[in-house]
A protein has these predicted regions:
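Conserved donor-binding/catalytic core segment of Leloir-type glycosyltransferases
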Residues: 3-19, 25-28
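Short alpha-helical donor nucleotide-sugar binding micro-motif in glycosyltransferases
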Residues: 67-68, 75-80
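Aromatic "clamp/platform" in nucleotide-sugar-dependent glycosyltransferases that forms part
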Residues: 88
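A short, well-ordered alpha-helix in the C-terminal region of glycosyltransferases
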Residues: 149, 156-170
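A structural motif in glycosyltransferase catalytic domains
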Residues: 9, 24-28, 40, 143, ...
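Nucleotide-activated donor-binding/catalytic signature segment of Leloir-type glycosyltransferases, i.e.
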Residues: 52-68
Length: 186
């Protein structure tokens, strides 16, 4: 389906400003200059036209997948090399939980929900949202460095993925959530 040996960067979510897709596309353009065997997969629905225009120069390295079934999504989690969530706002993200369940290294922002869910995360994978004239901004440079680190350092990426899988088992598996639910109501 994709090129042999391609590194797959996976974004899953709505296509709108709050999810940071525009920053991701800009950062990805920098990544492929240094790691040309990399592909960005964008799964989700929304208005693609803006993002297609943004990615005109790199369209051959981006695959816009659209909305898909949960089973198909799980197949993408299994083949992806990294999950990226450059969101400006998240609460309890099912996408983050699913990515951790599949042992993906994640690149996240320091927005409240994600920081609480993935508190062990290596600092190099956590992007800092900065306020600029009452508007939150994300550093494209920081994001591209994080992406490049994961797609070029397989050993480190595997270790971060293992930490995420452990975090999933310790806090978000069905058994752990059932126990927490029972404890809360007893």
């Amino acid at each position: 389906m994709f090129g042999e040996g391609e590194k797959l960067i996976l974004f899953v979510g709505r296509l709108d400003d709050i999810k940071g897709v525009d920053y991701l596309i800009e950062a990805f353009a920098k990544v492929i200059k240094k790691s040309s065997n990399t592909r960005l997969l964008i799964v989700g629905d929304g208005n693609y036209s803006r993002y297609l225009q943004m990615s005109a120069d790199i369209w051959s390295r981006i695959t816009f997948i659209g909305k898909i079934s949960k089973q198909k999504l799980y197949e993408f989690y299994q083949i992806a090399d990294v999950g990226v969530m450059p969101s400006f706002h998240e609460q309890c993200s099912y996408v983050a939980i699913e990515m951790m369940m599949h042992g993906l290294p994640l690149i996240i922002t320091n927005t409240t929900g994600l920081s609480e869910m993935i508190h062990h995360q290596n600092v190099e994978c956590r992007l800092i949202l900065k306020e600029d004239q009452n508007e939150l901004r994300l550093s494209v440079e920081e994001l591209s460095k994080c992406l490049l680190k994961i797609v070029t350092d397989d050993c480190w990426a595997r270790e971060v993925g293992k930490l995420n899988r452990c975090r999933y088992k310790d806090a978000f598996s069905l058994e752990k959530m059932r126990m927490a639910f029972e404890s809360f109501y007893s």
